[in-house]
Amino acid sequence: SLKGGQHMADTVLNTTVFDGATKLITHYNVVSDNSGSTTKIVDVSTLASNNGKTCKTVRLNKVSFNVSVTAPADAIRMQWDADTDVVFQSLAGEMEYDYSSFGGLKNTEATGFTGDVNVVLPACTAGDTGTIVCEWIKVYES
C-alpha cells in the first residue's frame, strides 16, 4: 500500500543484449505511472574493453521503437549525458531509423560529457509505454 507522499515509479526494464568488441545492443522498455523517469541505457564505464582500450562513447547506428504517449509533447528523449544533457533523438510512434550509412549519430561531446546515454520519459499519462532497441557502435579512447 502507498502511504502519504509516496508514489510508485515508472516500471523500467533496461538490459544490455550484446556487448561486443565494436557493437552494443540495448533494450529498454517503460510503462509509466505518470511520474516520468530518466534511465541510463548506456554506461560506458561498464562496457567491455577492446585490446585493453576503454570505450569512451557510443554512436547510435540503428534504433527501432514503439512509443505510445497520449500527448505528443511527452515523446521519449534520448540524451548524451553531459553537464547539460544534449537531446539527440526524440521518439514517438512506431519507427526505425538506420544511421549506418554514415557511421551513426555521434556524441556531441558537450562540456562535461561522460559518454553515457540517458532516456527520458517526461511526466506523462499513466499507462503510456515505450520500447526502444538500439544498436550502438563503440568508440574507444585513442
Where are the regions a protein language model picked out?
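Short, Lys/Arg-enriched N-terminal segments with co-localized hydrophobic residues
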Residues: 1-7
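Solvent-exposed, flexible loop/coil segments flanking beta-strands in beta-rich domains
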Residues: 9-51
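Short loop/turn segments at connectors of secondary-structure elements within structured domains
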Residues: 12, 70-74, 113, 126-128
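Noncatalytic modules at the cell exterior or secretory-pathway interfaces
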Residues: 104-128
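An anionic, turn-rich surface loop/hairpin at beta-sheet edges
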Residues: 85-106
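C-terminal interaction-tip segments
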Residues: 8-22, 122-142
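A short beta-strand element within beta-rich, extracytoplasmic domains
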Residues: 57-69
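Short, surface-exposed beta-strand/strand-loop-strand elements in extracellular ectodomains
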Residues: 69-91
